[in-house]
Design a protein with these regions (language model features):
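Small-residue hinge/turn detector
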Residues: 77-89
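Glycosyltransferase-associated regions of secretory-pathway enzymes
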Residues: 1-76, 94-271
Length: 271
């Protein structure tokens, strides 16, 4: 393990067991000297050594009924900014591999991804007391009838939702990403922080649309990297079922990184 103690990072897990890709990504931050905390909604059986486990309620109360009606990602979208506000740690998704340490002096850590140019919030640090985090938290805590950026079609989808449903569920059912990249992009534009975004090669060097390359033994994943690259997003929400249920092929990026970090994929496959 690296002897240098770097800035803290943290994430959230909802469930009882990590997949090997999540173990790999968490451990990669530990190995590079980042104090790494995993906030959990329940006890997890296979957290890698070196990761600090804390209850998610250290950051906020958890309404699991809302999660059941939306998704785990909905909760994480609210949680990440509350976590930053409370702890000043860098938020990392559990499928973000640490390629190089996050510089201590970097005050804004976020970037666009894929081919659309919208900001992603899979790896995020923004100032604890800035206008951007204030507007994001205000949005989540005081949900509007419809997000300001919604078009007529999206607004109609909200109106079609049953009125007795929680507003978070109604918005989620109308647009699944309304609490994640859409919200982050919109509010960053309103506050002027959009211009502070890093280029995609820093945090999302491989576009989401090409995520199979991590499992291809002949894929040139590193060909996407630049000298700027700090994090490599593995996009497990888009990983094909075969790769989730089977060990990665020898010489693929996933297999090589597991060997480097000491992770045994066979012990943490999707069942």
């Amino acid at each position: 393990m690296a002897s240098t103690v770097r800035r803290p990072v943290a994430s959230l897990w909802i469930g009882e067991r990590l997949h090997y890709l999540n173990q790999l990504c968490l451990l990669s931050h530990v190995k590079l000297g980042h104090p790494t905390t995993l906030y959990c909604t329940e006890k997890i059986s296979n957290v890698p050594e070196g990761v600090t486990v804390r209850p998610a309620t250290d950051i906020m109360s958890i309404d699991m009924e809302i999660v059941k009606q939306t998704s785990e990602s909905f909760l994480s979208n609210v949680f990440r900014y509350k976590m930053i506000e409370k702890t000043n740690a860098v938020w990392i998704d559990c499928d973000a591999f640490c390629h190089r340490p996050f510089p201590d002096e970097m005050e804004n850590i976020f970037a666009g991804h894929g081919f659309r140019g919208a900001l992603n919030c899979g790896v995020v640090y923004i100032p604890q007391k800035g206008e951007l985090i204030f507007q994001l938290l205000d949005y989540y805590q005081n949900l509007p009838d419809a997000p300001a950026w919604f078009n007529k079609q999206q607004r109609k989808r909200i109106e079609k939702q049953e009125s007795h449903l929680p507003q978070a569920v109604r918005i989620y059912n109308a647009e699944r990403t309304a609490f994640g990249p859409q919200a982050f992009t919109w509010f960053a534009q309103q506050t002027g922080d959009f211009e502070k975004a890093l280029t995609s090669d820093y945090l999302y060097p491989v576009p989401f649309q090409l995520n199979d390359v991590f499992f291809d033994p002949y894929g040139r994943v590193e060909g996407h990297f630049t000298d700027n690259t700090l994090s490599v997003h593995l996009y497990t929400n888009g990983t094909k079922p075969w790769w989730r249920k089977n060990v990665p092929l020898s010489n693929s990026y996933a297999a090589r990184m597991c060997a480097e970090m000491g992770v045994n994929p066979a012990e943490a496959l999707e069942e």
